[in-house]
């Protein structure tokens, strides 16, 4: 009788530990995918940023929502998922396809889709474990507003090559922030 009871206790402890730990396990390849996406986005550049200085704009990236020093994993994953989804939506629009090399754009969007799948799997783990913080909704709304400003800008500029170059550079900065955040979260787990 003692052995089945001990076995049941081990199962309960393992179950409790796996559901109460804050972390979620992103695949080892996630950081590599992030870096590859940044490389692809850099390769997509068609114009010198200097030739588009007149078109530059501050879109108000919500840096505090991805600040590696202030955010916890339970807050970070939903924000990073929203960021990735918004970038994917932006670059899969019909107006986007005319602006970029088709092969690079396809590879970039495929990589984003893989990242999004990783993040959404992680998000499902977090949702299953506990209630997510209320600040998550504020953070996701901040990301949506940020990308709305980008979309309006592109429309106002009639999706000009310079407008897309400004947006490409802006998205590169946003993705770089997300890579830094994920790196910090990975370090904390070790």
From Swiss-Prot:
Disulfide bond is among the record's keywords: yes
GO cellular component term, pick one: extracellular space
Family: Belongs to the alpha/beta interferon family.
Gene Ontology terms describing biological process: defense response to virus; natural killer cell activation involved in immune response
Compartments in which it is found: Secreted
Coiled coil: none
Key word Transmembrane present: no
Signal peptide coordinates: 1-23
Sites carrying sugar chains: 101
GO MF assignments: cytokine activity; cytokine receptor binding
Entry-linked Gene3D superfamilies: 1.20.1250.10
Keyword field: Antiviral defense, Cytokine, Disulfide bond, Glycoprotein, Secreted, Signal
Disulfide bond positions: 24-122, 52-162
PROSITE patterns: INTERFERON_A_B_D
Superkingdom in the source lineage: Eukaryota
Protein known as: Interferon alpha-9
Protein's job: Produced by macrophages, IFN-alpha have antiviral activities. Interferon stimulates the production of two enzymes: a protein kinase and an oligoadenylate synthetase.
Primary subcellular site in the record, as a coarse category: secreted
